[in-house]
């Protein structure tokens, strides 16, 4: 299996190169040249396997230059009870008849990013060894909150790596900020940016592809890579949990093998829902992919109209991990939907860079409307949904998951579709305690974040994750705030270039 760049179909590399580079030299994203298939018999054969074994089975289809031993080394180390608070790794909870929550937040940082970022360091260090690179790998991360902490936790003290995380100073929750700024490890760095997530992401991409910076790194015996979902090594682990959850639903008798399900994903950067698209096109019977956005609803408008327009007001919301107006992974989807037309991709994304806007052709619009349904939910709707779920079903969810539930309710109201549905629950309610409490116990005001965590615990009976409880006594190590234009200098200075 080779990987191509979305901006140069003639470029072909193996998965180890795609993972170690993170992004193609032309600024494109790596995609597998074909989507491997998984048959119903294969899905059935996974029923009695552990999550780690299911993951290894899926990875073997995509990472064909890795040996079985290398893949199992990665999966065995990443997906274990030493990293996750459940041996199932991801849990499925029935919310109400035929609607299930896929809980992806049982890892060390209490967000779905752990599902990929616990294994990415093993993928990356294995790739570097396979390629005999003999270079220190410098991981640059732009984060809207969850990726940063999950990447820091995954890469801390990993030999031969250094990681730097940039986050919008006013664009993450207080718990997310505390998680990042207290990070332990000798090879980690964290810096706040005056601006929003898109400023962080655009400048990280710019630093990545700057030839002069690349040359300076090369001379110093270093090379960049990415832990964002622009890196294929981040995206492919997300495909696994959609494959695995279908198998679990069938094994538990909730569905029969072959039955279609809908999948609802709250998303800003489009990676999590793109992983579900890959699972569907491998052979997992997924009917509709439902894309849930907050008021930064650029994806909703795009899926409905075929026009991508980031020229709009940016809102800081209670679901900050989705406060994004430039959805990087959309480039991969459009490459697939245009039958790998790299010229169209370069044209559209050139227009996005220059004008902040592009419109896809009618063929792509047609497929978008067939495969996807999109909706959005504002902060008030999010708050009401958290309360409704808590009151009706005694289930406590975070803000991002609430957005997904509300959009799914809108989908059902519009379509009447009663297909059984899996909703991706992307973060622990404890990561957004203030917003959760504002919904379910508005009298709880004036508390600090740790009192809020304790109050959520009293109301929900969900165990407080140890990693969050321990934050109270940790010292803040990283307090620097810079402008987006200072990011490149910060990187160079941090690396001693």
Predicted regions and their residues:
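PLP-dependent amino-acid enzyme catalytic core
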Residues: 1-497
